[in-house]
Amino acid sequence: MSIMRRRILIVCAAACAGVGALAHAQAQPQQPVSALKGHNSNAPVDVTADRIEVQDRADRAMFAGNVHVTQAELTLDTERLTVAYSSAGSIQIDRLDASGGVVVTSPSETARGDFGVYDLNRKLITLVGNVRLTRGDSNIIGSRLVIDLNSGRAVIAGGPAGVAQSGGRVKGHFTVPNRGD
């Protein structure tokens, strides 16, 4: 086989492989990405509440009553919030602990739970107790939710049997788009 003919066969094989790979990639369903993926946990945090108590020696502030937190496109609403911070130089918020009807909202999702922790250093939001994650008309119910703000990945666990309404299992309801059948 001549060198020229061998090169033509290699180019044709590569072209066919490329077309096959493209067709396979287009056939794969696109996974929805959370609006919280890549959330800037270094953005300023704004907190409003009915009452605040600052415990400077303990490097924490406690907010109570209609607490509303915003950071970029993320909002958190709750009844009570403890803000842990470090005060070496300037104040840097490390963690938010929320209790009492915690609701975390992004442009496309809403997550609810009894208690919540937002670890700004690890870029994780954890909700526990009667957890519900809603996106559009779809929702998932469980006992614990962890949202990784780096990847946008959300993991929901069911918890021990008999503890949660879902009987220890995760329960989901997903809407299906009309396919014009």
Residue ranges and their predicted role:
Residues 1-181:
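Mature-chain termini and adjacent capping regions
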